[in-house]
């Protein structure tokens, strides 16, 4: 559908929605219900930031070592319909919002701060087409998916946090370039062996 035809259709529908009175599903006075107008339905369905509920485990991509309360939060994310099937609703503006989350690990609990991504502007853009991968080549991802949220700790003074736990570094093993042992130092090299052979031959000739 061309953009001009789409605009003409939208104008015609707007005029029809303004001139036509809404008709209730039930004619009886006891069953009268409010009918949402077409313009309101269209406005609610457009691509825009809207409040959604997201699980924190999904935001952190499974990097959760403690129980989080609450286990899900509400954030503003892009969503809605686009006028063409070849378009998708994507964010063109985002920012970070910090929230306090209670982290529980028996027998203690502490408050932490979580930085979550929120969308402020959305737009319908062409869908990304996946590039064809040749069977004799292995597809290598350009980037590794990163979590949308970052969890930081706000512990009480003196309390240890995961960032404070230092894992001991294993003791270095024997080096591959270690000095030769005493046994190997006693074994004559090729030059020493040649000199000994020459000295033996001279001694035999003199005898």
From Swiss-Prot:
Disulfide bonds join 78-122, 82-124. The keyword Methyltransferase does not apply. Pfam families: PDGF. GO terms for cellular component: extracellular region; extracellular space; membrane. SUPFAM superfamilies: Cystine-knot cytokines. It is found in: Secreted. The keyword Cytoplasm does not apply. GO terms for biological process: angiogenesis; cardiac muscle contraction; coronary vasculature development; heart development; induction of positive chemotaxis; positive regulation of cell division; positive regulation of mast cell chemotaxis; positive regulation of vascular wound healing. Residues 1-21 form the signal peptide. PROSITE patterns: PDGF_1 (PS00249), PDGF_2 (PS50278). One of its GO terms (molecular function) is identical protein binding. InterPro entries: Cystine-knot_cytokine (IPR029034), PD_growth_factor_CS (IPR023581), PDGF/VEGF_dom (IPR000072), PDGF/VEGF_growth_factor (IPR050507). Homodimer; disulfide-linked. Can also form heterodimer with VEGF. Belongs to the PDGF/VEGF growth factor family. Growth factor for endothelial cells. VEGF-B167 binds heparin and neuropilin-1 whereas the binding to neuropilin-1 of VEGF-B186 is regulated by proteolysis. This is Vascular endothelial growth factor B.
